[in-house]
Amino acid sequence: IQRAINGIKIAIEQIGLQEGHEIAMGHTASSANRIAYTMKEPIGVVAAISAFNHPFNLAVHQVIPAIAVGCPVIIRPATQTPMSAIKLVEILKEAGLPNGWAQAVVCDRNAGELLVTSPKTAFFTFIGSGPVGWYLNSKSSPGTRSALEHGGVAPVIVEPDADIEAMIPDLVKGGFYHAGQVCVSVQRIFVHESIADTVASKIAEKASKLVVGNQLDPKTEVGPLINHNEVNRVEEWVNEAVTKGGKILTKKKRIGDSCFEPTV
C-alpha cells in the first residue's frame, strides 16, 4: 500500500511537467520572427489488464498515471483478486473523480480481450504472462499503443569468488518471496561447479527454515499460492525434476490445499 501511495505522489508531481516545446523558426524568410510550438494532449481511453500478485499496487500503477494526464481508464483486474481494483475505483470516486473516468470490469479473458480490440481504446496496458501479452498486442486495433509488463525467468550466476554467506539469504528471499509469485523472483541459479554442492546445501538449509503459513501472521515467510491449481503445478514440476534425475535437498510436500513447502 505504501508503494501505491508513493506511485500516486509521483503521478501528481508529473502533472505539471507534461509540457510542450517552443521551437525557434527563422530558417527561411517566410518563417522569420515566428515561433512554432508543440502541445501534449490526452490520447484517449486507456484499457488496463492487471495481475493478481500485487493487486492494489499494480492497479494504481496502471490507472493513476493515465488519469493524471487526462485519460479515462477501464481496468480489468485478475479474476482471482478483483476487489482491490474495485476499491480503487470507489476511492477515486470518493475523492471527486467524475463518473466514468475510472471503471473496473470483472470478466473472463474473452470479454477482457474486447477491451484491447475495441477501436475506441487508444492505449492498453497489460501486466501478466508473455504469451498472453503478445497475443493481445497482435489483436489490438490499428493505431492502439501498448505497454506490456511480462513475467521473467530471472537467473542468478554465481562465480567461484562470490561471497557465499552474504548471498544465500538474498537468493532464498528472492526465490520464495510471495511464494515465488513475483515477476522478478529468482527462478534459476547457475553455480560454478567448484562450489555447486556448497551453494546448493546452504540454500537448502536456509529454505528449510522458512516459516510457511497464513500470510496475515507476521511470523509467516512463505504464504499460500493463489489457487489450488498452482499448488498442483508446483507439485508436478518437483515430480518432473525427480523423474529426470533431480535430487531433492529439502522436504517436498503440500501443506493443505494452498501451500507447498519451499523446495530445493
Predicted regions: what they are:
Residues 20-166:
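Rossmann-like NAD(P) dinucleotide-binding subdomain of oxidoreductase/dehydrogenase enzymes
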Residues 1, 23-31, 217-222:
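Short linear capping/connector segments at secondary-structure termini
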Residues 96, 123, 130-264:
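ALDH superfamily catalytic-core signature
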Residues 1-21, 32-33:
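Long amphipathic alpha-helix in the N-terminal Rossmann-like dinucleotide-binding domain
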Residues 2, 82, 235:
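Conserved catalytic core of two-component sensor histidine kinases
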Residues 5, 63, 85, 203, ...:
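Short amphipathic alpha-helical/adjacent loop interface patches that line ligand
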